[in-house]
């Protein structure tokens, strides 16, 4: 009886298992055939039985039903249904994009670049060589600023600021001077007081729709991007209401073991004594100062553990008046406490005083706000208004000491970038053959560093002379610009088309810079020293006597202008699988300066030149998902605003001098790239690039009489070449992103060398400044769609690169190869809430800088060595972690 029961039970179980089938399939876009990620698949009538398509668009759904109907839905697509039965094999569900009709205009209800699929589509359809990072990728990234996010893109490294945070982008090994930054396709000014490059750490990443890194320029783009261009595209108004908010907190592990140093920056006087007096030197009046003209409250320092980091953001977007008016507003705020610990073992050119230890404490208050409005008059006419404001306020203490002396710096900096753009897009004639767009721009960048104080301690007491210095600096950069483009499309037989496009732009830039510095001595004299612990315990208790006249005549007091006009003609020809883009751009530059206090030189000067910049781009579709690209283009790089000013700055080791005869750089650029997009969010790219720079700008030595100066100069020709590989591959729940860049460059400059007891000038060949020969990134992605869990582990490697250029042969400072590991994870709920966590710099690998073995260092004793050279310093930044909540609502 027992055997009969067991046999019956086994048969029943087997019968049941026969009906417990697993439905497998893919969801694809009906028009493009691309896989769709994140679509919900439900069996009709059983809402509790559902699945979500994975990273490759696939799904697996277990059911006991022998037949039924699958329903598939996703925002931006119409619901799709498909019948199944026990005989159904692997299914393919087609989904059609949802569209909104507006007076013959068809608007697809999807984000322009927010998803990985959209980012790959932009890369695939672009006419030139471009890499795109989507908002979704930035959201999942462990990073929260654009400067740190962008380093994960192919061919991009970043230059760090004094606290170790990423600040400037280096594209394909080309220094930051060789690329430019756009916001919504419009160039923005820089808050830097000498140069034109834009610090990317001022931008919070969460307000962006995508980042586009363009590596080959077309004729309708501004031509001064030898390395390329970084375009920060802000979020657009959605077709239906969207609301998102986030709040997170975190901490830097660096301050678990030590205190955070801060000072009372709120007590800083924003104007220098000279400015408060009305700048009397401009009117030949007395401008002497006394101790009463300076505050001491701002020099009060505190040692404490910092507050937790706070990061928050909010965005709202919707359309009104039947979809005609679109609104997108976003705001982001970050209050972060960062720092680094550094040990300087060897300082070239200085007497050995033992290891100098430096502790950096940096509080960052970062704010970003922007509003985008667009109004669709009809399907053919559209107006857009954009206003963006990016603000960074940074308070930093640098406390450096060795066995003999101590130097403390207290610095507060405020910089902002404001940009407002009005743009119109118009279409005319049948099938929109004729198109016109125009743009008006007003932008301003500003930076101020008031009362930047440095205090010098000798052992246990204040130095008697040169006890302190305090400086005020501020500068502004204002742009007014206009752009216009017009195009006409010709349709020919065999489905070929020709788009002729012409346009131009004009920008008027006005820049000014102010610098004022004061030196202080101890009023107590050499026989009555101010001893720590006896006469003072905090820096605001020191007695400091200013020298009567500060340095108000510094050459950093200057006004500059730049007027750029450009026109271009360009054609885009499409035939079958071939696309040809050819164009010619003409740019006219008038750049000049006026010194407020000229020194035995012309107080005014300017440079005028015109460049012809041809470009040709070929794109050939090898098959449906693979393309071969070839690009040639000529581009330029203009000197920095301060570099052509005939200034002289006295330094301890050598003097620095400007160069009014400095020429702009002209480069010829070649690109060859193979692209394969096996699926909508996957790619394989391999590309070669080659650049020949004529008159590249680097710093070298010149001799005038008995004096030697470090000055910006043109050094003949330089070559920069390399290879880039980019891979993205997704499986159902697992994905890989990887890229690798090899770059080789060479430039020959002048250096100092010893010939017996004589100092002579020689030439030496080296790579371009800031370039790493090897750069690699690897990200492992995990997506468990049904559980709502996504995770990412990211590693990056930056090879050895030139960190600081010496004026002596073989005495350059190199930064050793560096590995960084970061991770993030998030859990989403159906109610729209997501819990996330981010962790950075998990390995806490120190940054190591060293000088290769050379005659000046080979006989040094007592110094730690690396690969035979002398270690100059090590820096530690510590790990940081963050946890938070994100809420997202999208109207269906």
Question: How would you label these PLM feature ranges?
Answer:
Residues 28, 39-44, 73-77, 90-139, ...:
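Short, acidic, small-residue-rich periplasmic hinge/interaction motif at the N-terminus
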Residues 60-62, 158, 186-215, 235, ...:
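Short acidic/polar hinge/loop motifs at secondary-structure boundaries
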Residues 93, 202-244:
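A beta-strand signature from Gram-negative outer-membrane beta-barrel systems
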Residues 187, 393, 446-449, 510-512, ...:
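Surface-exposed extracellular loop regions of Gram-negative outer-membrane beta-barrel proteins
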Residues 295-398, 418-420, 616:
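Transmembrane beta-barrel wall of Gram-negative outer-membrane proteins
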Residues 405-423, 552-565, 636-693, 703-730, ...:
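Outer-membrane beta-barrel signature, preferentially recognizing the C-terminal barrel domain
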Residues 689-692, 711-805:
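Gram-negative outer-membrane beta-barrel transporters
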Residues 797-804, 827-892:
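C-terminal beta-signal and adjacent terminal beta-strands/loops
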């Amino acid at each position: 009886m027992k055997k009969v029961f067991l046999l019956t039970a086994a048969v029943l179980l087997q019968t049941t298992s026969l009906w417990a089938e697993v439905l497998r399939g893919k969801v694809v876009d009906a028009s493009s055939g691309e896989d769709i990620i994140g679509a919900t698949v439900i069996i009709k009538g059983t809402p509790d039985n559902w699945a979500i398509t994975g990273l490759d668009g696939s799904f697996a759904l277990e059911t006991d039903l022998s037949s039924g109907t699958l329903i598939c839905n996703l925002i931006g697509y119409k619901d799709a249904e498909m019948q199944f039965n026990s005989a159904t094999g692997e299914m393919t569900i087609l989904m059609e994009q949802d569209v909104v009709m507006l007076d013959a205009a068809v608007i697809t209800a999807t984000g322009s670049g927010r998803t990985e699929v959209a980012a790959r589509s932009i890369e695939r359809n672009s006419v030139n060589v471009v890499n795109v990072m989507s908002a979704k990728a930035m959201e999942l990234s462990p990073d929260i600023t654009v400067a740190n996010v962008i380093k994960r893109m192919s061919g991009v490294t970043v230059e760090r600021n004094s606290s170790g945070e990423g600040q400037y982008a280096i594209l394909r090994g080309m220094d930051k001077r060789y690329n430019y930054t756009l916001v919504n396709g419009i160039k923005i000014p820089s808050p830097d007081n000498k140069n034109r490059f834009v610090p990317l750490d001022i931008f919070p990443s969460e307000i962006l729709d995508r980042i586009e890194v363009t590596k080959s320029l077309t004729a309708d783009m501004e031509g001064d991007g030898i390395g390329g261009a970084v375009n920060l595209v802000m979020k657009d108004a959605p077709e239906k209401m969207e609301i998102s908010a986030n709040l997170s907190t975190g901490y830097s592990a660096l301050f678990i073991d030590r205190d955070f140093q801060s000072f009372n920056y709120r007590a800083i006087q924003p104007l220098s004594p000279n400015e408060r007096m009305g700048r009397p030197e401009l009117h030949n009046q007395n401008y002497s100062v006394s101790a009463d003209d300076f505050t001491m409250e701002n020099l009060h320092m505190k040692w404490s553990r910092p507050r937790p980091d706070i990061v928050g953001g909010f965005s709202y977007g919707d359309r009104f008046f039947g979809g005609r008016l679109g609104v997108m507003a976003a705001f982001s705020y970050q209050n972060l406490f960062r720092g680094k610990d550094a040990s300087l073992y060897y300082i070239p050119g200085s007497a050995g005083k033992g290891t100098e230890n430096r502790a950096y404490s940096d509080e960052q208050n970062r704010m970003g706000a922007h509003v985008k409005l667009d109004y669709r008059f009809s399907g053919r006419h559209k107006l857009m208004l954009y206003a963006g404001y990016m603000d960074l306020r940074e308070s930093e203490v640098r406390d450096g000491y060795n066995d003999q002396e101590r130097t403390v710096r207290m610095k507060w900096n405020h910089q902002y970038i404001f940009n407002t753009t009005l743009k119109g897009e118009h279409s005319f004639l049948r099938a929109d053959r004729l198109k016109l767009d125009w743009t008006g721009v007003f932008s301003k960048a500003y930076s101020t560093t008031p009362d930047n104080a440095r205090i010098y301690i000798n052992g246990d007491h204040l130095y008697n002379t040169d006890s302190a210095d305090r400086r005020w600096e501020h500068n502004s950069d204002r742009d007014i610009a206009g752009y216009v483009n017009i195009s006409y499309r010709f349709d020919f037989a065999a489905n070929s088309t020709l788009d002729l496009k012409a346009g131009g732009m004009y920008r008027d830039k006005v820049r000014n810079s102010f610098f004022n510095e004061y030196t202080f001595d101890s009023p107590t004299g050499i026989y009555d020293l101010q001893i720590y612990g006896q006469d003072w315990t905090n820096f605001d208790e020191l007695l400091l006597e200013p020298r009567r006249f500060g340095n108000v005549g510094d050459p950093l007091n200057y006004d500059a202008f730049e007027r750029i006009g450009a026109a271009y003609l360009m054609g885009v020809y499409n035939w079958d699988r071939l696309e040809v883009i050819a164009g010619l751009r003409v740019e006219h530059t008038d750049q000049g300066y006026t010194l407020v206090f000229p020194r035995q030189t012309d107080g005014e000067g300017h440079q005028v030149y015109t460049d012809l910049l041809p470009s040709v781009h070929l794109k050939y579709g090898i098959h449906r998902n693979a393309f071969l690209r070839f690009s040639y283009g000529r581009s330029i790089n203009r000197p920095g605003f301060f570099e052509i000013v005939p200034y002289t700055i006295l330094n301890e080791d050598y003097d620095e001098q400007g160069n009014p005869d400095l020429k702009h750089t002209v480069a010829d650029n070649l690109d060859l790239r193979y692209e394969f997009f096996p699926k909508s969010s996957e790619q394989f790219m391999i590309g070669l690039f080659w650049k020949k720079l004529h008159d590249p700008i680097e710093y070298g030595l010149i001799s005038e009489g008995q004096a030697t100066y470090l000055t910006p100069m043109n050094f003949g020709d330089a070559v920069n070449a390399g290879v880039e590989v980019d891979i993205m591959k997704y499986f159902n729940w697992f994905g890989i992103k990887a890229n690798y860049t090899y770059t080789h460059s060479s430039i020959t400059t002048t250096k100092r060398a010893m010939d017996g007891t004589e100092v002579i000038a020689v030439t030496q060949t080296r790579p371009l400044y800031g370039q790493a020969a090897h750069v690699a990134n690897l990200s492992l992605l995990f997506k468990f769609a049904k559980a709502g869990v996504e995770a990412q582990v990211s590693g990056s490697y930056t090879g050895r690169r030139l960190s600081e250029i010496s004026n002596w042969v073989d005495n350059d400072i190199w930064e050793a190869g560096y590995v960084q590991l970061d991770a993030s994870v998030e859990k989403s709920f159906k109610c729209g809430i997501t819990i996330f966590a981010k962790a950075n710099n998990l390995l806490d690998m120190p940054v190591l800088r060293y000088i290769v073995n050379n005659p000046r260092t080979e006989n040094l004793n007592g110094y730690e060595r690396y690969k035979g050279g002398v270690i100059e310093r090590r820096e530690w930044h510590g790990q940081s972690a963050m946890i938070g909540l994100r809420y997202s609502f999208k109207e269906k």
